[in-house]
Design a protein with these regions (language model features):
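Aromatic-lined glycan-binding groove of carbohydrate-active enzymes
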Residues: 15-57, 92
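Conserved, mostly hydrophobic/aromatic
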Residues: 4, 23, 30-33, 82, ...
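Glycine/proline-rich, positively charged
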Residues: 1-18
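Structural preference for beta-strand elements that scaffold enzyme active sites
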Residues: 1-5, 29-31, 108-111
Length: 161
């Protein structure tokens, strides 16, 4: 089995236009990381509120610099528009984010981080969730133009430069 390990989430879609089509053609699956956009898609970060103490967004060792791109009021407000979608399906925001990623036929698996066993139990349930085309469209509508899609952002820096 050959796979690629790119970043991929409802907010970070840079692999969709070039990597995914080529991978499908060549029989390469995706084992994606950051399917919940560093926790942003869990809904725990709220517009107008400070990030919870001890969260990834407040801890430099856990990637506070990396997550900062998603900590704008615009992004957090859009993500909260996904809550009624999750509620309507009787699933958590985390499960919705993971199910969205796993809906891509080229995604073989998703690497998720968890700080508690309960998070693992909750997130594993996403593997059995199938989202309808209407739900997928509702997620796209909620996020609007926010998802990053520029394939140039998928390039690795040249180590010899």
């Amino acid at each position: 089995f050959v796979s690629s390990q790119p970043q991929y989430s409802a907010l970070w879609r840079v692999i969709e236009s070039e990597v995914v089509p080529l991978s499908k053609k060549e029989g390469i699956g995706q084992i994606v990381w950051s399917p919940m956009a560093q926790g942003i898609l869990t809904g725990k970060y709220l517009p107008g509120k400070k990030a919870p103490a001890g969260s990834r967004a407040t801890d430099k060792k856990s990637g506070a610099d990396f997550i900062s791109r998603w900590m704008s009021e615009e992004v957090l407000t859009a993500v909260q528009k996904m809550k009624p979608i999750a509620d309507g399906l009787d699933i958590s925001m985390s499960q919705l984010a993971l199910a969205w990623v796993l809906q891509n036929s080229n995604v073989s698996s998703a690497i998720m981080g968890a700080t508690k066993p309960s998070q693992v139990k909750e997130n594993v349930k996403a593997s059995g969730i199938k989202l309808s085309a209407d739900v997928m469209q509702a997620i796209d509508n909620a996020l609007g133009k926010l998802p990053e899609r520029d394939p140039k952002k998928n390039e690795s820096p040249n180590p010899r430069a």
